[in-house]
Amino acid sequence: MTDATDTNTPPELPVALRPLAEYASVQTWLDGLKQHWGGDPATDDPERLPMLEAFCGYANRDPDQIIKETTMIKDGEKRIRLKGRERYSKLIDGWQATIEGSRIRKGKAGNTVRSFLIHNGVLLASGMQG
């Protein structure tokens, strides 16, 4: 029987993030936003990158790790890892609930991270949970 307070497993160190623009998955996201909406997605919403960075800290993963944990290549095609998608969907909901402010602000934070996943091929339902 495994105890949730098992002291044999060392605690996970906090992820050390590089500037987000250095991650391939972030470039994919920003390129997709630019193609879809135009403008400069890195600057047209100054909260966009800080929100993703905050989520990465919450999940303790860098952006590329998140995409690796939610996708795989099978038979030469990118596929979604269902367990990974479910895990991150729940993490987004949990993180979104910790955001200070209105329901709309919480929804924007969650939907920003969902947008990152969607533009990297991980389809998620949009939501204003809160």
Put a short name on every predicted segment:
Residues 39-124:
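Non-catalytic DNA-binding core/recognition domains of DNA-processing enzymes
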